[in-house]
Amino acid sequence: MASIKTKICRNVRVEGDVKFGFGCMIHPYAKIIAEEGSSITFGDYNIIEEGVIIKACSKLNPKTKNHESCEINIGNYNHFKIGSYLENTNVDNCNVIDYRAKAVNSYIQSKTVMAPLTQLKEGRVLKESAVFLPQDKLTFNYFFDEGVHEANIKNLVGILEHQFNVAETKK
């Protein structure tokens, strides 16, 4: 079972207003960047693997010509796999963002899977239980077991926290 602290490995870049819930695991070479005036808030038990980039960037409002801040909220029990990229994208609970998947200015609801190398178009909402496949194909997983997913994430965090050279822990 994982501890209640977030584990941040060495060689991780965390900048700006970033908050973590309990039991998160941030692998080496991940980048979590909240630009000035923006923020990123993680829930509990999120796994962020190597090379993942999660950014909150201010956006230019064409009407006012002002830059507006962005607040990203990432729920609980999400797994961001190697090289995935999210920018100004909110994520609900129990999702798998697979290898080198990309989402910009989007919204990912709960219990979804983004397959490897997929890209959500800007402004798109990935609906609950969706499985997003290459070539913009979409199917739905109505048999997703949230309890099993949560248990698997907790077990994985428990294993990983002993495998990495942890630079810091945060309560």
Predicted feature locations:
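Glycine-rich hexapeptide-repeat left-handed beta-helix
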Residues: E35, S39-K171
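Short amphipathic alpha-helical segments enriched in hydrophobics
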Residues: H27-P28, E50
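Generic signal for short, ordered secondary-structure residues
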Residues: S3, M25-I26, I74, V91
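Extended, small-residue-rich solenoid/repeat segments and analogous flexible loops
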Residues: M1-M25, K31
